[in-house]
Amino acid sequence: MSTAAPQENSPELKLSPSSKLNGFEWWRRTLSYQTGLGLNAEEKAQYEFDYNNRNLAEKCQQCNEYRNWMLEYSPSVLFMMDHIKKLTKDKEPILTKENITCDVCDFTKGGGFHPDEGILLCANWIRNKWQLEDILTHELVHVYDYLKFNLDMNNLRHHACTEIRASMLSGECRIWQEIKKTGLGNFGKKFQDCIKRRAVLSVSSNPICKSPEEAEKVVSTVWNSCFNDTRPFERVYR
């Protein structure tokens, strides 16, 4: 169970020289990336690769600080942690700060959850505190579903349902974020389209899924029941 990062990087890319990773030149590249001005596809891919592979120790430290802040102050994270604690009852807690781990990832994911290992937050894919909040909330929904519904990731319907719920409840598909990515067109369906897109992408990566077409079919099959299930929240509020 994992949260997809924005883009895949070419395996042929290598880290740029240090002169391009610091100071004015890095500021200039960042501005070009953010505005899209004077940036071709190759330069965009190189910037993303450099961003995700520079200052890794610093990014892990920052990720830990963000995680600690969220575990102390984030309404959505605290709410999910409380409901997960209720499901574990008197058993050994499934989650603590010690097994919500920040690390460098060599795959294009923002995070992941494994029942035996806890939650992984990919420090080199996390750009700011609020993205970490979305990713952590997403993974906490997976933890909740695992405890509440006996989630089986070898069942594609289970996988599709928890991905629909996690993208819906985490805030990753906020309307304003989708407008920034895709413009104002098809405004009324942006939220649903984002959730479906992310769910299909995740299910497609499941080893037992045969094709993207199968992933789309499974997501469509469970859509109505899972999209309308906001537990443990009363409604979608992020």
Curated annotation (Swiss-Prot):
One of its GO terms (cellular component) is mitochondrial inner membrane. Its main location: mitochondrion. Keywords: Hydrolase, Membrane, Metal-binding, Metalloprotease, Mitochondrion, Mitochondrion inner membrane, Protease. The active site is at residue 139. One of its GO terms (molecular function) is metal ion binding. GO terms for biological process: mitochondrial protein processing; mitochondrial proton-transporting ATP synthase complex assembly. A divalent metal cation binds at residues 138, 142. It is found in: Mitochondrion inner membrane. It is a peripheral membrane protein. InterPro entries: Peptidase_M76_ATP23 (IPR019165). Its EC number is 3.4.24.-. Has a dual role in the assembly of mitochondrial ATPase. Acts as a protease that removes N-terminal residues of mitochondrial ATPase CF(0) subunit 6 at the intermembrane space side. Also involved in the correct assembly of the membrane-embedded ATPase CF(0) particle, probably mediating association of subunit 6 with the subunit 9 ring. Belongs to the peptidase M76 family. This is Mitochondrial inner membrane protease ATP23. It comes from Candida albicans (strain SC5314 / ATCC MYA-2876) (Yeast).
